[in-house]
Amino acid sequence: WRIAARLRLPTRTVARAFCKASIGQVSRLPVLRLAPVREEGNNCPFLTEDHCAIHEAEPLVCALYPLAQEITREGEVGYFLQPTRCGGQVFEAKVGDYLARYDVPAREATDVRWAQTCLALEDRVEALEALFEPVFQRRMQQKLWQALYYQYEITQPFLPQLEKNLVWLETELEKLSALQRRRNVRFDKSIEKIER
């Protein structure tokens, strides 16, 4: 959303043009990552002449580097140093100063809400995947993409839209669950007829 708002483009357009989409192997949630440009030495698509073209909207992973952020289910935030051999300039700084330099504290509440959302959805998706037939699994993934990445207006604040999308998503997941239950009942009845 941040990049789309910076570029003034719809979120789906930005995702298709600049990102690689996948489903997390562990989380089973949709994941968007900036797609490296092979012709540019596998660098970020927004790296132009050694500068970030979207610096004001850069992803958290870029703003934090070489630090990484960890958020618990309870919303506790921690930072740690990633091992790096990038060959860049080495400097010493206090974590708080480093984070403030890149305006990380201002977006921490959003990061916490996003992380907690994803952690809760991991559990929900795992349970639903065990119940759903493949067609309903695919529909669920489409709904997740909508709620987490695509159903956003770039002129509106992110968090209220996320909250609205999560309410919508819960309704949609309940509809899919109800459809699956009805199919299961019909299937069970048809098996009973065959067995008679």
Task: Kindly give the residue locations of the regions a language model identified.
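Short loop/turn segments that flank or connect secondary-structure elements
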Residues: 1-196
